[in-house]
Amino acid sequence: MVASVSQQALGPSAGPIVSRAFDAKPPTAEREIDRKLGRLHDHAREFARLGIGKKIELLRDIQQRTLQVAEEWVRAACRAKGLSMDDPVSGEEWIAGPALTLRNIRFLIRALGEIQTRGAPVIADKKVRDLSHGAVAIEVAPYDAFDAALYGGITAETWLQQGIDRGAIEGHQASFFRKSDPQGGVSLVLGAGNVASIPPMDVLYKMFVDGNVCILKMNPVNEYLGPFFERAFKTLVDKGYLEVVYGGGEVGAYLSQHDGVDDIHITGSDKTHDLIVWGPPGPERDDRKRRNDPVLKKPITSELGNVSPVLIVPGPYNDVELRSMAENVAGMVCNNGSFNCNAAKMLVVPKGWKQRDAFVQQLSNVLAKVPPRNAYYPGAFQRYESLTSGHSDVRKIGQGNDRVLPWTLVLGLDGKDESERNFYTEPFCSILSEVSIGSDDPVAFVKEATAFANDRLWGTLSAMLFVHPTVEADAGGKTAVEAAIRDLRYGTVAVNVWPALAYALCSTPWGGHPSATLADIQSGLGWVHNTVMLEDIEKCVVRSKLVPTPKHVYFPGHKSVHRLGRRLVGFEAEPSWLKVPGLAVAALTG
């Protein structure tokens, strides 16, 4: 049976409803919400003051229960998205669902243990680097010896805001655990509908980093996951520390304005955020923004999407490198059917780049081998039509139908056209656009591309640069690239790798750049994951080799990513060196 769902239930910016592979849950009644919030309020102070050892016990309990529901969870997600459990692409659901949730739990257990013994998550002095602009960078990945073995080619740093020196780091870390008399509070988490690990990981952050109890409202798009989360977090529910509710925009609005909610975290769209914070569009909202008088009178943090740029710095790329870059970009586009806030959405290439046509052909060849996916997220077909119509060079790759959208390149946009909607509209569907700017001089291009990404593209979540080793080896090139990493106003800046790794590594912070404001929210404010519990963060910087060996698991065509994903779930639940060879074999046979 496929249940019908009203447009209103999904919220104001959801778009048309796609057919469902699951029965819709009835919205939680207001009186039941009142009861749940009252119960949470009664236990908020108790949870805030719970000993660290007790919180570690709770996390270990969640860890085991998450492992127990993992296969059912993945099966439900695959069914909803039209995937076969036997298809390698189902590995996306293993990895982006229970595996990352378990990794987050594992790192939180370590962090709490270090707080218990040392007062804060441990940061070795050798992991701290002074930056030229008066800030510090803390290496947070590899986070442990397992990370070094499994992801040795990837490094990540958390950059703190300018003016915080290495001697002051501990004062900008784990502040909740420095409180002598915490009162706690009730946090509302408005769950995302696209990636299965987002709701539970947002809950974990609000509870075990911020110290609040939580009410999680499931998104109607993936509300089928709610019962698995309730089972995985059962002990928290039983103790009055967590509640899960269901419904669309009306339930979200009721919760957001409820006196029993102290603060809010939302993963969704900027339109939904502004509706909550400023009220419906119109003169009254505009006036409220001018007066800085939001309707919402409580704190809100958010992660709201992006027109994610990929900047290709010119360099002497050979055929192997161009092929790897094409696979990299295709993976960033195709993962989860392109319904990711960090999916590659705007190629920014040098004007006059001699390898441009060869790269586009390589990318087209890779995409042609990836079967198009169900466009399961509401509004995808309408956004697709809006962002492809009126453009002169639109290349559709693969066949679409009433459920499937083809991978699509929208090429040759005019970088000077301030009205170009692809620059300010997040596609959240299978589109990748391209624009040529600047020149084919690496130093000049990097400077112009940074300004273009900052000033012309919507969003502040994540950006990526492809950089050839010879450019980094050149003093002028390296200086220009490092300046771009510093100056790009994005919460994550990645070199040669998908910025989504900052989401997946968990020791890294994930969120929009802090330059946003409540009135101009861009990709949101605040951070999640961040198991090192750093505060006053500027951004995360992730780096990898131009041609990774083995290939990153998100590259299309990996033949064993479903087996790798299943093994990762078991590993993250109970890590052991005995499990590493099996993971390596699964990765290498892709």
How should these model regions be labeled?
Residues 57, 402, 446-559:
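C-terminal core of ALDH-fold dehydrogenases
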Residues 153-197, 201, 208-210:
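Active-site-adjacent "gating/activation" loops or surface patches in catalytic cores
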Residues 186, 220, 235-346, 351, ...:
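Conserved NAD(P)+-binding/catalytic subdomain of aldehyde/semialdehyde dehydrogenases
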Residues 210-221, 241, 296-315, 329, ...:
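Short loop-to-beta-strand entry elements in the cores of soluble alpha/beta enzymes
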